[in-house]
Amino acid sequence: MKIFSGSSNKPLAQNSAKELGIEVSPLEISVFPDGERRIRVVDNIVDEKTVVFQSTSTPPDQNYMELFFIADALKRSGASTVTAVIPYLGYERQDHVFRDGEAVSLEVIVKTLERVGVDKLVAFDLHSIKVPELFTIPVLHLSALDLFAQKIKELGLTENSVLVSPDMGGIRRIKMLSESLGNMPYATVEKNRDLETGDISDSSMKGDVNGKTAIIVDDMISTGRTIVAAERILLKNGAKNILVFATHAVFSANAPELLENLKAEKVFVTDTILVPKEKRFSKLEVISVSKTIAEGLKNF
């Protein structure tokens, strides 16, 4: 197996390769003055199984184009298979038409990945369990929930705590985590979002958090407004303490500032997306998924 990395998250590729006891193979990635990219495979990879890491977070278009070029270069260089490890799958929320006249952006991404030679895909905590159905190639859908359960146990939060989904779409995720924590109680926040602006107009809650530690769990944090709205409802309903867990640290706009100013004690994310120094804040703690990816690749 040969492992390669795009530009978006080299530390995750290196750590995952280390877990497998191998080195990341070199790639020449150069950028022309006009911004176009050129990819060149350096090593002989004829008949080799290859893996390429690339999170397609900000800037998603640039990261996807680089991934397409890498996959094409690997196949042209004789790789027997190309497995794309895309820990955060950009455009995954655009998986259907919300309003007339829209493109289904994720379908375009899927078709392109398959067309350029990707044979298998590894992703983490997809926004919808239906996303893998869009692919004709095998998809390994990994999750950070076991890592979250482990951290919750380490913090001694298995008693007098409630898992909270910040929206109705995360109920399945919360139920799975609840089961791994001995059927920990859970609550859900219902929110109404404007499809044009993305603004959350109002929220309500189902479940009891009064006097308890509320543990918000989501697949991603983008603008941070969903977490802010959820915290407001939880405090209103008597939550004693609040912690936040999310797989993907998208952190768009002023999300880091909003999260730092939460009443929540800690915000836990994973390294599916590389969080730059300017987006880090004192309440943030990053949990690595490198071992989970390495174990997944062994049998995929």
Regions found by a protein language model. Name each.
Residues 1-300:
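PRPP-associated nucleotide enzymes
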